[in-house]
C-alpha cells in the first residue's frame, strides 16, 4: 500500500498525455497560435482593455555619458507605469531596443545602476543587475519598465509588495504575469508612437532576471515584436 502522495502524483503524471504537446504532425506556426490562444485564456488576457495612454515625458537629462529619459504611461484605465530609457550620449541614429525587467528588488532603478535605498549598491554589484547600463554598452537603447508590485508601482524601499495585488488579481480572473505582459505591450506601443527617431524594434530584445525573467518568458509566448528573449530565471517548465 502507498501512503505517499508524491508517489501517486508521479504515477498519474506518467500516464498523462498532454493535450497541447507538440507531436510534429502539424505546422509549427499553427501549433504556436493554438497554444497562445489557450495561454491567453488561462492568464486572463481577455480582462484587459485598451485606454488613452496619457503619455508624458517627465525628465530628459544627460549624465555619466548617457542620455536618460523618464516617462509615465497609462496602460489600463486608472493605472500608470514608470519607464526609463537609457541611451548613449552621442547617438547617430535609432538603436535596437532592449527592454530590461528587474526582478524582486526595490525597483527598476536597479537596472539603471542607481542606488536609492540601503542595500541597493550590493544588489547591483552582487549580481551585475544594472542591465540597462550594460545594454547601452552593447549598442542597445535600454528601457527599464517598473513592474507591478515593485518599486514605484506598489513596492517599498524594503522590496516588492506584490503578494496582495497578485492574490487580488486572481480574484478578478487575471494574474500579475498577465498584467506585466500587458504593460510591456503597451510600452512597446508608446516606443513606436513617440521614440521611433531614437529606438527601433528591429533587432530588439527583452530580458529579465528573477521575477523579470519569469515575465520575459511569458512575454516571449504572447508578444512577438521582439527579435529575441533572454529570461535568466525563474522559468518553470511545468
What residues fall within each predicted segment?
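N-terminal targeting or regulatory segments adjacent to alpha/beta-hydrolase or S9 domains
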Residues: 1-67, 75
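Glycine-rich, phosphate-binding/catalytic loops in enzymes
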Residues: 4-12, 115-118, 160-161, 224
Amino acid at each position: 500500500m502507498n501512503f505517499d502522495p508524491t508517489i501517486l502524483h508521479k504515477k498519474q503524471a506518467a500516464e498523462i498525455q498532454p493535450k497541447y504537446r507538440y507531436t510534429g504532425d502539424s505546422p509549427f506556426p499553427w501549433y504556436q497560435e493554438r497554444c497562445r490562444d489557450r495561454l491567453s485564456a488561462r492568464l486572463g488576457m481577455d480582462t484587459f482593455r485598451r485606454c488613452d495612454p496619457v503619455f508624458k515625458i517627465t525628465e530628459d537629462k544627460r549624465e555619466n555619458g548617457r542620455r536618460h529619459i523618464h516617462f509615465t504611461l497609462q496602460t489600463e484605465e486608472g493605472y500608470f507605469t514608470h519607464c526609463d530609457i537609457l541611451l548613449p550620449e552621442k547617438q547617430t541614429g535609432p538603436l535596437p531596443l532592449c527592454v530590461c525587467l528587474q526582478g524582486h528588488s526595490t525597483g527598476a532603478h536597479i537596472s539603471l545602476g542607481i542606488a536609492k535605498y540601503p542595500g541597493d549598491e550590493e544588489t547591483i554589484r552582487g549580481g551585475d543587475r544594472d542591465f540597462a547600463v550594460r545594454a547601452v554598452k552593447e549598442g542597445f537603447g535600454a528601457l527599464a519598465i517598473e513592474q507591478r508590485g515593485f518599486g514605484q508601482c506598489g513596492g517599498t524601499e524594503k522590496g516588492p509588495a506584490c503578494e496582495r495585488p497578485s492574490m487580488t488579481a486572481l480574484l478578478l480572473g487575471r494574474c500579475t504575469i498577465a498584467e506585466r505582459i500587458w504593460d510591456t505591450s503597451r510600452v512597446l506601443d508608446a516606443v513606436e508612437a513617440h521614440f521611433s527617431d531614437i529606438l527601433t524594434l528591429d533587432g530588439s530584445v527583452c530580458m529579465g532576471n528573477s521575477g523579470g525573467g519569469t515575465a520575459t518568458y511569458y512575454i516571449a509566448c504572447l508578444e512577438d515584436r521582439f527579435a529575441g528573449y533572454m529570461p535568466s530565471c525563474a522559468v518553470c517548465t511545468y
